[in-house]
């Protein structure tokens, strides 16, 4: 595991080497070394989308999240995990949340949970409209570039991935799918 915190990348570091310590530059890693990935795998059940959510974290995003969990203590950690699997409006039902891998020595942190997303389904005139986008993104707030006095800095360089898949039931057909954003 070769994680290097972003805040020291590109800095000089002294490496012990007996009587002659070495000064070297800490290498900068690519932005994709830090990943925040949330995926949903749904199927239609009654009037709701039901399925599994899978959250993966690597690099600075993993370190940030693990610090957040550690600061919260054991009492609130399950609630934090469930909130991170939920949509921004927290209107989905999240159950059976559990860690798959939270070992700090491993590259990825991973937790999963069961999801019931009833607000994603709207039915009218025998047709079903499905909203797959949970709008779950930590850093998607609008940046006002007209009123700012300083440069805008994101907290860390990272790739944020949000993916949702839906298994279409037998006998159903897709009538319209909006273009990709």
Feature locations, PLM:
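A sensor for short, sequence-defined functional sites
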Residues: 1-181
């Amino acid at each position: 595991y070769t994680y290097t915190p972003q805040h020291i990348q590109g800095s000089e570091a002294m490496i012990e080497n007996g009587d002659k310590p070495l000064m070297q530059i800490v290498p900068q890693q690519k932005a994709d070394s830090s990943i925040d990935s949330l995926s949903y795998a749904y199927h239609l059940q009654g009037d709701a989308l039901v399925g599994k959510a899978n959250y993966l974290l690597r690099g600075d995003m993993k370190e940030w999240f693990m610090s957040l969990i550690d600061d919260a203590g054991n009492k609130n950690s399950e609630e934090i995990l469930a909130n991170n699997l939920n949509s921004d409006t927290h209107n989905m039902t999240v159950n059976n949340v559990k860690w798959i891998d939270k070992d700090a020595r491993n590259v990825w942190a991973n937790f999963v949970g069961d999801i019931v997303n009833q607000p994603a389904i709207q039915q009218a005139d025998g047709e079903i409209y499905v909203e797959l986008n949970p709008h779950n993104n930590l850093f998607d707030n609008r940046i006002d570039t007209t009123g700012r006095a300083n440069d805008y800095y994101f907290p860390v360089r990272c790739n944020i991935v949000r993916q949702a898949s839906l298994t279409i039931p037998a006998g159903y057909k897709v009538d319209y799918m909006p273009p990709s954003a």
